[in-house]
């Protein structure tokens, strides 16, 4: 998010937008005061009209830092940019001879602009990064994968702070405790957590689970927990384990190792060989973690290392995370819209988006420095209590680290290009098999999931020539009360009706890339014709529909494919296209089942207290801490409810009435 400094300065920010057609003013959450200024041209791409529209705005632009947005005739954002001097930067778009073909196309589509001035260029950079992630304009360099990274949380804010828990965490950091990360992937967190459980035996359960245990759980049996819930370890000994965990995650692994060796030798000298074996196993777990995190980071304690490589129109940036001199994994990013742009500019745009919602370490190493290095350093440093610096090492161990990141980026591109070549050939085969008009750019696959009609959900996954587009996945909670439990046809009707009625309203011309070229349905002829009828009700007839059904005995590898015209196909068991279509179906099935399980788990953990008006998370927690269970809350007297911390007499009366007053 934007730094506090930037937020304060936005109150000094001036929006400029003149509306030639007296359009209504749009509000924006970044400013208090707005003056609207729109510059419009024709509805069709026209370079002269685009230059004229941009030229009009130059008359009012100051020589101040700020951010500009370019819109097409439909009001869609084409591009978000920032400038040290707005007038000079925007003027460049009127010099056609100096623009690349791609930027000329953008100018020809531009019909209006929005300008926001900021106090400093650093603030403009942070605002630009936030707007790019918010609107994902087609002419900006975009991160294809901008999900948050996972952390390990040593949680100490629960019911039993004397027994901290070790958990994985992703998202907003609300819980009290120490966060360690980021880790590059969920797999790296899982691997580290498993090893930490073997090494330090800290609990990983929730406070409610911990409170209600009467005997040790399975983790104790497999030696991954010390069972503090039932007193198998004292508070002091458990606190020592928590301290060792903090030391290890803070990079003091040698200190922890020496401590374990000393304890093992002492147990052996005391002829307590069983205890010595426990310390031996913990040392093995420590060695395993160290072997998987070993990296020669030189003098770097906390750093991010970036390497960018471009080839065949594809760009990849590899990032390595060094925390407390430990390698916490690496992650590959693939970038869109980098045509004809210097790699310094690509790195500038990428890093601005990357750190928009992440904490930047002190040291950042790259093989190409960002084009506005000083501005980016100022922007990132304004959010921290230390100075963030970018480096481009030329020799030594740090250069080897950057080279390693670049090498990984090259290998990732090689793999992606090989996969793309294979996938393109498979899509060509699909065109011939299913009689499609063109190679499908967007394939949508649908599936439903439920158990005996409960927790009914639908799932939609999206794939294209580049693979799965996970940012476009959608989940649907089945809402219609008239659907009979387990009626797959009616569930599919609701899902498709909601999906395409919304799309039809937003884009009746079918010009958006959100429209699919092919629908792949898990089912046979009946499902295919049902989907055809559902789309026809929406006035949609230009989308190909294919059903995939299990063959005889429902054996995988003997699937049949059903078209709208009634034709049916089967592919050889060793067909690459068959394997690809199975992957699409299985991914939709996995996504739908995962959505269903999450909904079911949420319902299983719901409480009658959730239905009491005026009872939020804090009061619910206070009630459960005081009484133990929702049943005890329900059976409590009014005077007992009034004794709970944070529960007033009025709220106590409200709770009591909810559970004890019968309907008239």
UniProtKB/Swiss-Prot annotation:
Gene Ontology terms describing biological process: nucleotide-excision repair; SOS response
Record-given protein name: UvrABC system protein C
Pfam family, one: HHH_5
Residues of the UVR domain: 254-289
Species this protein is from: Zymomonas mobilis subsp. mobilis (strain ATCC 31821 / ZM4 / CP4)
GO MF terms, alphabetically ordered: DNA binding; excinuclease ABC activity
Gene3D superfamilies assigned to the protein according to its UniProt record, in alphabetical order: 5' to 3' exonuclease, C-terminal subdomain, GIY-YIG endonuclease, UVR domain, UvrC, RNAse H endonuclease domain
Localization, UniProt: Cytoplasm
Any one GO cellular component localisation term in the record: cytoplasm
């Amino acid at each position: 998010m934007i730094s506090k400094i930037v937020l304060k300065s936005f109150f000094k920010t001036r929006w400029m937008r003149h509306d030639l057609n007296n359009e209504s003013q749009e509000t924006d959450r970044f400013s208090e005061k707005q003056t609207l200024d729109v510059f419009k041209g024709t509805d069709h791409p026209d370079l002269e009209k685009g230059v004229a529209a941009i030229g009009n705005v130059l008359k009012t632009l100051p020589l101040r830092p700020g951010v500009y947005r370019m819109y097409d005739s439909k009001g869609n954002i084409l591009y978000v940019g920032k400038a040290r001097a707005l007038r000079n930067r925007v003027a460049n778009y009127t010099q056609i001879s100096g623009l690349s073909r791609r930027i000329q196309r953008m100018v020809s589509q531009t019909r209006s602009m929005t300008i926001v001035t900021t106090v400093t260029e650093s603030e403009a950079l942070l605002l630009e990064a936030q707007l790019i992630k918010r609107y994902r304009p087609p002419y900006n360099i975009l991160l294809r994968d901008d999900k948050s990274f996972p952390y390990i949380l040593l949680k100490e804010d629960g019911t039993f702070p004397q027994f901290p828990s070790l958990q994985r965490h992703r998202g907003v950091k609300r819980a009290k405790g120490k966060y360690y990360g980021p880790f590059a992937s969920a797999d790296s967190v899982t691997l580290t957590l498993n090893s930490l459980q073997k090494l330090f035996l800290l609990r990983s359960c929730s406070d409610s689970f911990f409170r209600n245990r009467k005997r040790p759980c399975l983790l104790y049996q497999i030696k991954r927990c010390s069972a503090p819930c039932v007193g198998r370890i004292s508070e002091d000994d458990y606190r020592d384990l928590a301290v060792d965990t903090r030391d290890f995650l803070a990079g003091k692994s040698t200190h922890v190792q020496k401590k374990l060796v000393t304890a093992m030798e002492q147990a052996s000298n005391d002829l307590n060989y069983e205890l010595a074996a426990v310390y031996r196993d913990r040392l093995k777990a420590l060695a395993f973690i160290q072997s998987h995190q070993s990296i020669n980071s030189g003098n770097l304690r906390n750093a991010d290392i970036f390497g960018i490589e471009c080839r065949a129109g594809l760009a990849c940036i590899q990032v390595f995370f060094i925390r407390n001199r430990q390698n916490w994994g690496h992650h590959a990013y693939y970038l869109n819209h980098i045509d004809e742009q210097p790699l310094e500019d690509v790195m500038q745009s990428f890093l601005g988006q990357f750190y928009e919602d992440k904490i930047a370490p002190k040291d950042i190493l790259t093989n190409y420095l960002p084009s506005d290095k000083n501005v980016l350093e100022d922007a990132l440093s304004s959010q921290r209590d230390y100075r963030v610096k970018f480096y481009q090492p030329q020799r030594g161990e740090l250069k080897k680290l950057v080279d390693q990141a670049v090498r990984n980026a090259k290998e990732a591109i090689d793999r992606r290009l090989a996969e793309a070549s294979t996938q393109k050939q498979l899509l060509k085969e699909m065109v011939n098999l299913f009689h499609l008009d063109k190679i499908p750019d967007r394939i949508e696959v649908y599936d439903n999931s439920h158990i005996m009609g409960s927790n009914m959900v639908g799932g939609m996954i999206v794939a294209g020539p580049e693979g799965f587009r996970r940012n476009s996945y959608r989940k649907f909670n089945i809402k219609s009360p008239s659907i009979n439990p387990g009626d797959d046809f009616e569930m599919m009707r609701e899902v498709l009706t909601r999906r395409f009625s919304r799309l039809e309203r937003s884009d009746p011309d079918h010009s958006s890339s959100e429209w699919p070229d092919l629908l792949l349905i898990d089912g046979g002829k009946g499902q295919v014709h049902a989907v055809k009828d559902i789309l026809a009700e929406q006035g949609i007839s230009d989308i190909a529909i294919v059903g995939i059904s299990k063959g005889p005995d429902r054996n995988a590898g003997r699937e049949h494919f059903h078209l709208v015209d009634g034709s049916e196909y089967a592919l050889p068991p060793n067909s690459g296209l068959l394997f690809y279509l199975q992957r699409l179906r299985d991914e939709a099935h996995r996504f739908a089942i995962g959505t269903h399980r999450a909904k079911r788990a949420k319902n299983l953990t719901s409480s009658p207290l959730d239905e009491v008006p005026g009872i939020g998370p804090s009061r619910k927690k206070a009630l459960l801490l005081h009484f133990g269970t929702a049943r005890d809350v329900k059976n409590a007297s009014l005077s007992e409810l009034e004794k709970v911390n944070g529960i007033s007499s009025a709220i106590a009366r409200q709770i009591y009435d909810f559970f004890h007053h019968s309907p008239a």
